[in-house]
UniProtKB/Swiss-Prot annotation:
Participates in various redox reactions through the reversible oxidation of the active center dithiol to a disulfide. The H form is known to activate a number of cytosolic enzymes. GO terms for cellular component: cytoplasm. Disulfide bonds join 40-43. The record marks 41-42 as: Contributes to redox potential value. This is Thioredoxin H-type. PANTHER family: THIOREDOXIN, THIOREDOXIN H1. The active site is at residues 40, 43. It comes from the Eukaryota. Residues 2-114 form the Thioredoxin domain. Coiled coil: none annotated.
């Protein structure tokens, strides 16, 4: 079972990750995945900003994956540094932002929301 963290859904097991990914794919909406780590300073810096975005954008699915907790998932998605944000639609990677870059994160979400099927 995934824990709700504001509107950012923390995936703490591979099962929860797969379940949330499937739910997001079923909605055909934008999924933003935050690959993070508890020891990562920039990750802690960007987390409140991500939570704010999640509150403002209820039609976007925000997921959070701790790379140390779900090493296999991080490896499958070729995550090399944190934070890494993946933008998915219907199971496909549409974009990626590496680093705690608020502006780039916001712009990338806006860009993909504009192309989202309604």
């Amino acid at each position: 079972m995934a824990a709700e963290e504001g509107q950012v859904i923390g995936c703490h097991t591979v099962e929860a990750w797969n379940e949330q990914l499937q739910k997001g794919n079923d909605t055909k909406g934008l999924i933003v995945v935050d690959f993070t780590a508890s020891w990562c300073g920039p990750c802690r810096f960007i987390a409140p900003f991500l939570a704010e975005l999640a509150k403002k954008l209820p039609n976007v699915t925000f997921l959070k994956v701790d790379v140390d907790e779900l090493k296999t998932v991080a490896h499958e998605w070729a995550v090399e540094s944190m934070p890494t944000f993946m933008f998915l639609k219907e199971g496909k990677i549409m974009d990626k932002v590496v680093g705690a870059k608020k502006d780039e994160l916001q712009q990338t979400i806006a860009k993909h929301m504009a192309t989202a099927s309604t």
